[in-house]
């Protein structure tokens, strides 16, 4: 597990009028420069980031009297317990996960309320996230926190934080945090204002903690004013549709980053290592069958792994068939550069005790119909083992590796990693392009 970096609070969240945000922050730094006490404090000059954090799940659960914790967007034990309770009430499988069926039932229950209750839960959106991002030394964090109240005007808070990496630091590099709260309708009206809060001359990022919505005015304004739109496809209830939207955005020269992509790193590295020995390199070109098992509920990681290996080996999508069933099977065919056919199967495996992220890879197998090809490779998660893939044939002649689970795969931790990367990720974009071509050929059984 990663150790949290302690933060010094220069200014606790302070309510302020929208028109006074810049003046207030300027005064904060002026006061620090003239205080003459303690370590030298200065504002970071790195990047600005907007975080759009709707967090409807916790708000609706709270409105229905099922959740009494903080609104923080982190989906900890209290949130999962409330979701499980709601699922039981709605007659849905009690997983504690925020899936699309649960969201639909919650929205219907909320809309059926005669009066929308005022929430008493402490709203920590913005504050909690600012602590996570502050360790990456941003210059300014702007958190957008829509509320369920249909007519709540926009309110603002400003604060400042300094990460402490050493007990004897002579200087501190600090960041500003601006949190805006209000109804969704009011949020739609301040897109230009939010864009102006992003400091000129520095990289600008937007973490959109929801599905991409190119038709939404706020989304459009932020996408046009930033260098990169960041998402996490593990949130998506229909990642296939959202991946097509991703590709459309990239085609329009919008730089996209998906935090879920980083969760594949160990699987990609072990795949590459399996074919690194000289005697196996030719075998890689003989691969014509790929089976991927993932935790049922979100095929995003499976699709991205498929797109990654297809883009590396020059496979072109030919067909994409959704068969459904217990394992939500998808059968995809590719054609290689030497005109051979490759069959790919994606299987969603029901898991009794799922991990932190919906849709994590469980296992995969690369094989060939050529019995002389040295390419059979099985990768499987340490937590589930390789039994199903080994039962699929050829365990004795396969190279088998276990993938250690990541030490920390929360969205917040991966965001910190993403902030250390500057520039476009060509490997991701090439993989997504293959996925998009395949998805546009999708048919259903």
From Swiss-Prot:
Gene3D superfamilies: PGBD-like superfamily/PGBD. InterPro entries: G6PDH_assembly_OpcA (IPR004555), OpcA_G6PD_C (IPR046802), OpcA_G6PD_N (IPR046801), Peptidoglycan-bd-like (IPR002477), PGBD-like_sf (IPR036365), PGBDSf (IPR036366). May be involved in the functional assembly of glucose 6-phosphate dehydrogenase. This is Putative OxPP cycle protein OpcA. It comes from Synechococcus elongatus (strain ATCC 33912 / PCC 7942 / FACHB-805) (Anacystis nidulans R2).
């Amino acid at each position: 597990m990663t150790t949290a970096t302690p933060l010094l609070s220069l200014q606790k969240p302070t309510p302020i009028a929208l028109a006074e945000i810049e003046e207030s922050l300027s005064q904060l730094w002026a006061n620090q420069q003239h205080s003459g006490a303690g370590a030298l404090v200065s504002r970071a000059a790195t990047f600005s980031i907007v975080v759009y954090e709707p967090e409807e799940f916790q708000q609706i659960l709270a409105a229905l009297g099922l959740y009494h914790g903080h609104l923080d967007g982190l989906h900890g034990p209290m949130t999962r317990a409330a979701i499980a309770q709601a699922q039981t009430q709605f007659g849905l499988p009690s997983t504690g996960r925020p899936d699309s069926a649960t969201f639909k039932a919650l929205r219907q229950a909320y809309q059926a309320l005669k009066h929308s209750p005022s929430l008493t839960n402490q709203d920590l959106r913005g504050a909690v996230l600012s602590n996570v991002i502050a360790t990456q030394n941003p210059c300014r964090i702007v958190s957008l926190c829509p509320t369920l109240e249909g007519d709540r005007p926009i309110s603002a808070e400003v604060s400042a934080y300094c990460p402490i990496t050493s007990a004897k630091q002579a200087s501190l590099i600090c960041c500003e945090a601006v949190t805006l709260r209000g109804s969704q309708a009011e949020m739609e009206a301040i897109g230009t204002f939010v864009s102006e809060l992003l400091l000129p001359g520095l990289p600008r990022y937007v973490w959109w903690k929801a599905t991409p919505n190119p038709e939404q005015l706020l989304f459009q304004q932020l996408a046009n004013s930033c260098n990169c739109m960041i998402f996490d496809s593990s949130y998506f209830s229909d990642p296939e549709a959202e991946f097509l939207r991703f590709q459309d955005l990239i085609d329009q020269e919008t730089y996209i980053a998906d935090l879920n992509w980083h969760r594949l790193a160990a699987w990609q590295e072990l795949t590459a290592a399996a074919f690194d020995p000289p005697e196996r390199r030719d075998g890689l070109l003989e691969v014509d069958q790929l089976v991927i098992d993932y935790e049922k509920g979100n095929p995003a990681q499976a699709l991205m792994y498929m797109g990654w290996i297809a883009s590396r080996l020059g496979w072109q999508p030919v067909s994409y068939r959704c068969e459904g069933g217990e394992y939500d099977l998808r059968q995809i065919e590719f054609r290689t550069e030497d005109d051979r056919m490759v069959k790919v199967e994606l299987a969603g495996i029901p898991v009794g005790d799922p991990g932190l992220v919906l849709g994590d890879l469980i296992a995969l197998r690369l094989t060939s119909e050529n019995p002389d090809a040295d390419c059979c490779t099985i990768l499987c998660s340490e937590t589930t083992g390789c039994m199903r893939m080994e039962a699929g044939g050829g365990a004795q002649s396969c190279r088998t590796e276990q993938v250690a689970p990541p030490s920390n795969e929360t969205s917040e931790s991966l965001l910190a990693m993403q902030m250390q990367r500057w520039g476009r990720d060509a490997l991701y974009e090439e993989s997504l392009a293959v996925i998009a071509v395949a998805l546009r050929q999708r048919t259903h059984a």
